[in-house]
């Protein structure tokens, strides 16, 4: 992470750049040209300018002020990382937090500016020179990079800014000029995902996508999101930390499929595979020319996952059809091979987790207390021993005591603490196996607990079980079920601000849509074959955190005269710590569910454990 001094210098240099471009503010989102949650280092401009390294957030710099918006998962971490920098934390989602446009407007007190260059584009020098050192009454300008902002985001931001008398200007990425030693775009080799794990040929997937395009009246589409490209073509990569994807675009029409990526990434084996499947390849930068020359009458773009510049490159004769991603709902429903892969991956992951928990128990018993980083390294090492392990699926969250209240905490040498034989350890982790992706959270009692720790742990467990036990009509959306995870804690006046669950990719991104469990409305229906996490939590700043998470598979429950009903089947196989539970708070059916779950965990994992590990696991049920 950058030193605070470096952040201050970068903001100073950016302000000089802004004055040269005639800008009064500049906005840095978290995304890249592929509009994903996780991005290669090359496009981590928000982190570069602010020092905040969370996966979600927006940094805004004006000529005199700076602020960063992020959600509740990162409130505590962001406050710490922004301390000593020009950036003020804006807690997104809270009633008192202003919108970005409101805040910018409040920071710009009048519209009289000395223009040194009223153009964002470096080649418009004539207009800039004519305005040099001249004073005008103008509309204050807010700059963004059109390559890293979605179509929907640009429109919404433009409307919001205009309402408060500000003008949105799309132009260059200032980091191109200011970021010293900026990492390049990754050129790691692409790999083929075998059919035994993919479960469907890329030819079949392409045919399904073409059929969906025809139904929407579109002749073609640009696929931007990296996990969608990887899924569609049955390819994987290592360009994004913890996510097996590669930097590319796909332009698909009814007659052709073209993959735009760095030629260095294409091995001999992959080149033969692409040729066999009639997939053309062009350099990554070739998409610009291809869109400018696009001859189709219509092109479908997803406004929430396509960057603004894609549509602006198209000829005026091309009609853009806007529609939510056609691939996301296809990818979300796992086929038989993918489900089999998930089940097998969860067994291996469960074995690694049990071995880790046994190790932790012995370490605490011996007095050789590990640190949070030790916990991370040990668990990763045990996972790496498992067949088909490729990587972790996200940076491990090992938060002891107060660190457990930092929802997306990551231990560093500066923050690392040694565990003690008391309190709670919140451990959220996962792995990328070639046949499946895992995501699991366990909160572990290391010794005596306070009544608050026990009660919070029990409320979280009750919420997890209530949602996990749900039976619901096919087509129900996650918003309608989210309350089940929160109901028990709401009775105590407790809540958490993050979502309750997200989809999980098949050896792809650990966060996947379009379905979720969350309070705000998400229209995507829950359907058989979808994977989704259930992860309620309680976080007390400066004290402790508790979260319990399993990855679930949505399966058919029963058909009646009232319709089809679905249920959630746990895929994750790992014991849930029972020592913190206040049993008087648990209902009989909740206890029965927990007992049945632990019985299944033992039956499925014990064949792969040694006698000592079996004995310990047997005590957990």
Language model feature labels by segment:
Residues 1-621:
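Active-site neighborhoods and metal-handling regions in enzymes and metal-associated proteins
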């Amino acid at each position: 992470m950058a030193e605070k001094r470096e952040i201050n210098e970068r903001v100073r240099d950016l302000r000089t750049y802004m004055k040269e471009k005639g800008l009064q503010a500049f906005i840095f989102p978290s995304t890249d040209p592929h509009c994903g949650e996780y991005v290669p280092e090359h496009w981590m401009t928000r982190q570069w300018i602010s020092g905040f390294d969370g996966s979600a957030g927006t940094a805004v710099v004006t000529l005199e002020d700076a602020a960063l918006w992020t959600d509740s998962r990162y409130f505590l971490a962001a406050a710490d990382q922004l301390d000593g920098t020009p950036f003020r934390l804006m807690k997104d989602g809270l009633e008192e937090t202003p919108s970005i446009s409101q805040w910018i407007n409040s920071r710009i007190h009048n519209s009289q500016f000395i223009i040194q260059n009223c153009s964002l584009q470096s080649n418009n020098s004539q207009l800039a020179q004519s305005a040099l050192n001249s004073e005008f009454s103008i509309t204050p300008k807010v700059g963004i990079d059109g390559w890293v902002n979605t179509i929907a985001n640009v429109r919404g931001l433009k409307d919001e800014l205009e309402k408060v008398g500000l003008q949105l200007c799309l132009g260059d990425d200032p980091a191109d000029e200011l970021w010293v030693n900026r990492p390049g775009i990754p050129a790691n080799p692409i790999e083929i995902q075998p059919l035994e794990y993919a479960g469907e040929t890329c030819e079949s997937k392409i045919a399904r996508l073409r059929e969906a395009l025809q139904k929407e009246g579109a002749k073609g589409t640009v696929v931007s999101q990296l996990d969608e490209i990887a899924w569609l073509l049955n390819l994987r990569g290592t360009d994004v930390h913890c996510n097996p994807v590669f930097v590319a675009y796909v332009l698909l029409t009814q007659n052709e499929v073209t993959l735009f990526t760095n030629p260095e990434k294409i091995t001999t084996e992959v080149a033969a595979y692409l040729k066999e499947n009639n997939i053309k390849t062009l350099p990554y930068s070739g998409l610009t020319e291809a869109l400018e020359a696009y001859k189709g009458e219509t092109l479908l773009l997803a406004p929430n996952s396509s960057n603004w510049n894609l549509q602006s490159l198209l000829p005026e004769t091309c009609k853009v059809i806007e529609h939510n991603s056609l691939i996301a709902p296809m990818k979300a429903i796992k086929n038989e091979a993918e489900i089999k892969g998930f089940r097998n991956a969860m067994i291996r992951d469960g074995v690694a987790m049990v071995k880790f928990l046994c190790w932790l128990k012995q370490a605490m018993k011996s007095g050789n207390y590990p640190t949070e980083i030790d916990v991370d390294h040990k668990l990763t090492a045990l996972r790496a021993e498992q067949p088909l392990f490729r990587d972790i699926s996200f940076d491990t969250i090992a938060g002891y005591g107060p660190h457990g209240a930092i929802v997306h905490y990551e231990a560093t040498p500066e923050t690392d603490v040694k565990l003690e034989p008391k309190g709670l350890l919140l451990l959220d982790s996962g792995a990328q196996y070639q046949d499946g992706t895992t995501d699991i959270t366990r909160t572990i009692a290391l010794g005596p607990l306070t009544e608050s720790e026990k009660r919070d742990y029990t409320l979280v467990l009750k919420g997890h079980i209530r949602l996990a036990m749900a039976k619901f009509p096919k087509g129900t959306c996650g918003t309608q079920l989210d309350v089940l995870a929160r109901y028990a804690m709401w009775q105590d006046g407790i809540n958490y601000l993050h979502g309750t669950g997200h989809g999980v990719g098949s050896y792809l991104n650990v966060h996947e849509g379009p379905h979720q469990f969350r309070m705000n409305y998400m229209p995507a229906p829950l359907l058989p074959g979808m994977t989704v996490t259930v992860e309620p939590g309680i976080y007390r700043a400066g004290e402790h955190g508790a979260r319990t998470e399993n990855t679930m598979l949505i399966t058919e429950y029963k058909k009646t005269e009232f319709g089809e009903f679905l249920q959630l089947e746990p895929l994750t196989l790992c014991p849930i710590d029972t020592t913190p539970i206040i049993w008087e708070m648990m209902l009989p059916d909740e206890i029965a569910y927990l007992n049945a779950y632990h019985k299944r965990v033992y039956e499925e994992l014990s064949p792969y454990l040694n006698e000592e590990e079996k004995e310990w696991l047997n005590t957990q049920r």
